[in-house]
Amino acid sequence: MLDHGARQHASFASPVYRELAYKMIEKLAQHYGNDSRIIGWQLDNEPAVQFDYNPKAELAFRDFLREKYHHDIKALNDAWGTAFWSEVYSSFDEITLPKTAQMFMNHHQILDYRRFAASQTNDFLNEQCLLIKKYAKNQWVTTNYIPNYEEGHIGGSPALDFQSYTRYMVYGDNEGIGRRGYRVGNPLRIAFANDFFRPIQGTYGVMELQPGQVNW
């Protein structure tokens, strides 16, 4: 969940944000699209799937559900198992965004929300790529994902020429060995990332690697 002051605190569901972002991207593409010094474009930096509580995100989530369940609220209720704990919805307009602070949230709702959030990220990247390709005929376009494999958005923007990733082998104490993880790390991370990214399109890129200890 993001708010002002956090990294990547943008709402991809906001039409105003998208409009202004697309204007800026198109101006850049017009200026650099035929520049022989430019070989390619990296969209954003480590785009991710975020819990977005912007009012526009809630409206877009409802539209996402309407399309997925073919405007049939009963189909949604059946899929989400809402008869349990009296969660039944009478209308798509009653549905709110899942709030992580609440106990015992409906996991089907959370899963659909994560799919919605992934689709927002993918669509935003795809639209940026298509804008650039209007002007950049001989330049590739990619983005660099953090390999958060469970978020489901990686590889979901078909306009990209190839997928790229960022990988830090030593960046924390999450290897089960305490703070030694900052020194030892896990070199298998890069092998796993290679195996994950290569099958998506055959070609893939590595945009960030860690040369030593973390510096942020």
Language-model-detected regions and their locations in the chain:
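Polysaccharide-binding and catalytic clefts of secreted carbohydrate-active enzymes
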Residues: 2-189
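Active-site core of glycosidic bond-cleaving carbohydrate-active enzymes
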Residues: 163-167, 179-181, 186-215
